[in-house]
């Protein structure tokens, strides 16, 4: 039991050390006292936006909007065309399958139904 307890503590210490190392490599130490547990609500949203620059809207997004809309329309047309082709192909296959089954008769030895 003592060996299990010792290995558990060593594993926990190693895990915390690695977590602290990764956080400090990213520029924010994990165990520092600079972070508040419950930050003020008016500052929380701004901090989240500054931490995640991918959430901020780029300035050049409006210039490509008409071309993106046209591309979206073309993709929708292509999707509809593919779905229509699949549906017609499937219905043709089902028609061929059902027509071939009506011509065949179920036979067992010399008795056919």
From Swiss-Prot:
Q: What InterPro entries would the database entry show? A: U-IIB (IPR043255), Urotensin_II (IPR001483)
The GO annotation for biological process reads:
blood vessel diameter maintenance; regulation of blood pressure
> Which cysteines share a disulfide bond?
107-112
* Domain of life according to the entry: Eukaryota
Task: Tell me where the signal peptide lies.
Answer: 1-27
Gene Ontology MF: a single term: hormone activity
Give the protein's function.
Potent vasoconstrictor.
Q: Which family does it belong to?
A: Belongs to the urotensin-2 family.
Record-given protein name: Urotensin-2B
Organism this protein belongs to: Mus musculus (Mouse)
